[in-house]
Amino acid sequence: MTAPDEKTLATLTKLFEEEFGPIGNRQVLYVHAPGRSEISGNHTDHEGGHVIAGSLDVAVDGIAVATDTNKIRVADEGYPTFEITLDTLDIQASEKGTSASLVRGMAHEIAALGVEPQGFDFAFTCSVPSGGGLSSSAAVEAAYGRAMETLWGAPAIEPVALAQMSQRTENNYYDKPCGLMDQAAVCLGGLAYMDFEDQAQPKTQKLELNFEDHGYALVLVKVGADHVAATDDYAAVPREMQDVAAEFGKARLCEVNVADFDAKLPELRAKLGDRACLRAVHYWYENGLVDKRWAALNAGDIDQFLVLTRESGASSAMYLQNVVAKLGSEQPSMYALALAEHVLDGRGAVRIHGGGFGGTIQAFVPLDLVDTFIAKMNGWLGEGSARHYAISDKGAYAAWL
């Protein structure tokens, strides 16, 4: 585990002491949880499908100090400090959709391991952009989990198990639907392939790979529309996919035989409509593209990876339909995709990123074009919209300083 650099530690210490008073000679716990980028597998995780994701060089960084209270106090740079009491760890309806719900939910999960919850103060900074599809909420959940695991003396928690705790917290306490990919990527670190068919024990593989070594930069571009505002559009994707699965007596599309789907298509279309059927078509097509892209990356075949990524982007736009939230004159994601394609001029690849309906697009940009690409996208969409990211090999962890 790596300690924070001097600048990060100084920032965290200043924030902590401004909010909670001097640390003195008390023991300090450092916590780190990265953001993530979905590399392959657009809306496949919630159907038990396959995903490739990478943790990024942006993160939640925090320090925690135990107290003799029954309160957890949290200082998040740039936001009001808040606290929860540990009198009850049950879901609080008044906290849904708030940061406090994530603390209480993770406390419930860690306490369920058989440890006694104890108070602590936690100050953190977050360089993961919120509402941009880089999973800032998953990083925060994982950071709370690693802090509680260590401070409360819980048994060591495997990355996938911590991810499942974080997912339950987001689903039940924060009250937002999500698959497991975001949390798993944050907890695993590096570039990882995930198979979610077995929800209890997802299969994972990791690969050491740096896109820059193959001549490309991973660039994410904020489109100027927060995907948080499109929660209903997002929620409709798994709902419609699972409506299709339900017609076969199944819960998720991974449990449905594609040949059975083909045979029943006219009936499904008449009952569920075109979009639900199109989204199911995307699931199977994209799932296959994930496996092909993982094989290409393992073989070091970046050209084939890019061809398949372009196919994936087309499927998301045409069949999954998570690029445009509501038809009308404002289409920020489609606009950003068009501009990116214009600059790339047939090179690299670009696709919608993550949940879609706003947030970010993802581009793999030739290194000789990356400065021009970022400058042009920033000129069109606003300074800071486009950023070059690197894959980080560290998943969520905590370490005593």
Q: Whereabouts are the PLM-identified features?
A:
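Short, flexible active-site loop motifs that bind/organize anionic cofactors or intermediates
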Residues: 131, 295, 360
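Short, conserved glycine- and acidic-residue-centered signature motifs
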Residues: 55, 99, 329
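Structural signature of FAD isoalloxazine-binding scaffolds in flavoprotein oxidoreductases
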Residues: 50-69, 188
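C-terminal nucleotide
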Residues: 1-36, 61, 65-96, 193-351, ...
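Glycine-rich phosphate-binding loop
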Residues: 357
